[in-house]
Amino acid sequence: MDNLQWKYDMAGIKSAREQGYRRKIVARDISVSTGAKQYAYLLPPMYNLFLKQVHEKRDKNLYEVIDEKSPVRLYFDCDSFDRDEGGYGLDLDCKTSLKLFHDLLKNFILFLNPNSTANMKAHITRCIRQDKPNKHSFHAIYPGIVFKNINELKMFVLSFAYHLFEDKNDMRLAFKKQGKNKTLGRAFFDLAVYTKDRCFRLPFQSKKGDSAKLIPLREITLEEIENNICQPEDFVRKPDNVDTSIGDLLSAAVMEKYTGVKLSTYVRAYQEGVIKEKIKTKCIEKRNGSKKIKITTPRLEIEWDQMKIPGVETVEIREDKDFLQYFDPVELRGGFYSLYIHLLKDICYFLPDEVLKQWMGHTNDKKANYLIKSNRKKGAEYAMTGGYALELLAKIYGRCNVRDLRDPIPKPTNSFRNTTRINVTPDRWRPIEVSDMKKFFIDSQVRDLKTNTYNDCGMITAMADVDYGEKIALSKKLKMDTKKKCQFITGQMGASKSTGVMDYMVFSMISSIIANAMVIVPRCSLAGQTVKKIYNTYKEMISDKDRMKKIKNKRKIVINPYFSQAFTIGGLQEIYDELTSEITTTDTCGTICVCVLNSISKVRSHVFDTIIMDEPVTCVDNFYIDSEKKQKIPVKNILEKKGNTIAVTDLMIDMLMKITRNANQLIFIDAAFTEDVIRLCETLYWGAYTMQGTVDDWRKVLENEGVDQSNIRHKIKRIKDENILIRKWIQNKKEWNYDKKTDTRTIISTTEIDHFRLFRPIEYICVYDKKITRPIYTHIIKYDCKQTMMNKLLDDVREGKKLVVYCSVGKETASIINTINSMTSRECIVLPKVGGVTAKSLKGKENQLDEYMRSMEVVVVSSVLGTGTSYPEEGLFDAAYMFCKVTYGTPQISDMIQLSARVRATTTRTLHYHITTSTSGHKPNGDALKNSDYHGISFKDHLDKTYTSRDHLHRVHMSRPSLASEFMRNELQQSFGHVIDETLEKKLPTHETNSEIEKEKHSDGKRKESKMAQEIDKHHPDVYTDVMATSNRNMTDEDGTKYQTIVRHCVVRTNNTTEPDRTMDVDWDSSQGTSGEIFHRPVTVDRSRITEQLVATPGPSTSRKRKLSDDDEYEKYDSGIEDIETDVDEEEEVQNKL
């Protein structure tokens, strides 16, 4: 129809209709070879004119598009074939088959509803093909039976097929089908035409390039033409006014009789009958009364250019309520309802009810009101930013035209330098090669053992609860004769920091250099791995007999795991039993305790010579999280719950400080120390002696911080009292003069030792390994689009690469696994092993983790994998991917970087990552925008400040994507920088974005093509080139005049090619066509970089699509499902008239 606007593609149609725009849609063929179509809306004023033109046969290629959510009449698409010599087709002729089908349909309806009064009059059209006289095609429509939507109709038709063929009530309408698959069968009525947006041919219409039309069996008037349409215009525009009572009764009966039956959309034919087969479809479950039915619900993209929302070119949002003036609620509800709902969910957080109701027009929209109420409850704890509304405006008006002029989230007053990774330099950190670590520690311990001055021993002076004599006796009894000291050990990830320390600890324990030790780790899974690592190191050492001969006072060791469900981890019970069984009553043994911070109260002894804390900041984070979750007492009052949490926290802190106070040596290991963490650990080392400096110094510090005088006086008094208590334990160092003649001693001088000398200066050590020739990742690629990175991941899976994927969200893990499995099941012959490591899948299977990781070809892991777990094997995986989402409740960026280093050596040494932040994040309060001064506060205060600062930084990243992206880039490069030698200089990995790589590839391709074009022009001037470049060419006109022209190179054909290729003409001339002339459009033939336009001559032919065999096994997807009832007696008479 020329008066229709054929400008919509199907994407635009789907988008508008999905958002609630209800109009009848028609389609027409525009291509012979591909079957492509154009679509148009059929508005009410044009509907009658449309029916008139269809009745007058003015158009040839029109279809109606079946709307999925609108009522639809019962319709069938039937095909029958006369039986041939190969057994293909029906034994019945077309008239008998049609009558039999109609009778079986009547019987099935009465089977479902014995009291049915349905009008069974059918309107049938028939298509006769001259090139295939044995094929008979019918369309049958029953106007008296209307279903609520296409899904209920599909359930009815599939149940009808199940009743006939699966229950074998009547097998006469099922037959074998010709083609490659001889067992593939089909039914008289097609079962595959009840899909979304199905194009159903209208009466008197033919396909493009074919003259075979659908002709009614009896003559119809203009008033009757609408009975031959499946969905009249008012069915789509006013669905509530359509009577679907008969269809509802049939649907209810189908649900009752066929609930739980797996229905199929095609059949298989064998000698004994027809067997159904299950088809995999993407669907969701919806309830229909008390029953569940499955319907397909594909998600559609929004065509933003179709949205017409009133506004101006430049959008300025100065207040929250300004959002509403750029959105018309009536337009959104009518055409884009899902956008309307999502917009309400976003802006309802910060707009009052009165404003929203006034904007909504006080409509009684129950769904919208319910969503507003429920989403306000969910977001009551934090404020939203209106991110979805801003994004919607940006897509409609353009990102550069939308300005958010509201009070912005306050910028941080500093760069959170105390919360970011420190820069390791030789002036502060002492470089030590990993192979020299044990020697360094052992030599230090041996020197300390030769020093027996107890008056400045840190372990003694730290014990303030006993007198001096008891401290000396206790220190001698435990052989803790070393001075109190502390070491911070850092280095690049994979430099064997923890392994070196464990090696030193085990050797010192065997050699009786240290009495006992405690290892504190962040997680239970890592604690189990630490126990096994210590055990293996111990066994390896005692098996070296030459080495053991050099040790005089050898001891055996016992490893005690103190953490929740310790002995449920495979192998720990056996290790403990083996070590304890080797110890007799006469043996002296050393004890190594391995625990997590939360389980420190389970430790029986409170005196350990050496304390080793691995990943201290992760210990702190896990401790705070678990202390809130592990409340076994049911608490109804929130204040009581907080009180219990504080009590648990204080108890753990007191236990930790008591153990570290009694220790002689503290070792902290981390690959990414921050100033906050260093100060926290230093405070733990100093213990009660944290208060440093004179009273005047403290007064100046407090005044500079703006503390009022009353608080200053209170703090100064507390400092004085604490200094007095400290000075009570300061001993006087006396120098004596001994007189041999008189055998007397006199004091020469007395020197007071202040508390600064009770502890050794802290040592900062950076470990490097010369054996490591390159870092974990040498190349880091950032993807701005998540889908682009997902496509790259799927390409690697197709190529058979082994991949490890890190995710910050558990749901993301499941989604990626499902996507990979879906792709591989469709495209891969050999399916790869794809698995996931989450908290749920890992529970109770911790001992199988290593074997599971090594057996998978694609493994998707979440943060549950934990810090400290590592897989150093070269080539275990080919590449790594990281999906990082920064939002409430997800791991922090630094934690995700630690997670991405669990696999130490991928084949390509490449990390692909994508980072996204929540569009509705928290607005950080004032405390999150400044650093606190930690000078002179207690360990508990340090602990709270460290945790709070990290949490505040995470919230700032949530609300500032650019800051989060920059922080991620810097942290990745610093974390995976390779320390080369004792200079501690880092060789940083390269960092690129995917867009930069694609741009560079495009530029390289341009340069190569340009060079190739120049070479071709130089050596073969008679050839046009097909590369994207230009050059000057000398040309000669017909009269001999020479001139120069710029030619776009295209390797197509040589200049001396005179005869065009007539291959397509020969094919068309030899094809079997139907009656009438067929005019084909020009066809482009691509044959190995040769491009020519071939224009076909008019003549009898048929389209390439129709030339394909109708016997092909995939025809079931193209034909359609239809049923028919009719008065067939008039058929021959009508055909003679035509």
Curated annotation (Swiss-Prot):
InterPro entries: PRIMPOL. One of its GO terms (molecular function) is chromatin binding. Disulfide bonds: none annotated. GO terms for biological process: error-prone translesion synthesis; replication fork processing; response to UV. Residues 985-1015, 1094-1138 are annotated as: Disordered. It comes from the Viruses. Residues 1110-1138 have a biased composition (Acidic residues). This is Uncharacterized protein ORF49.
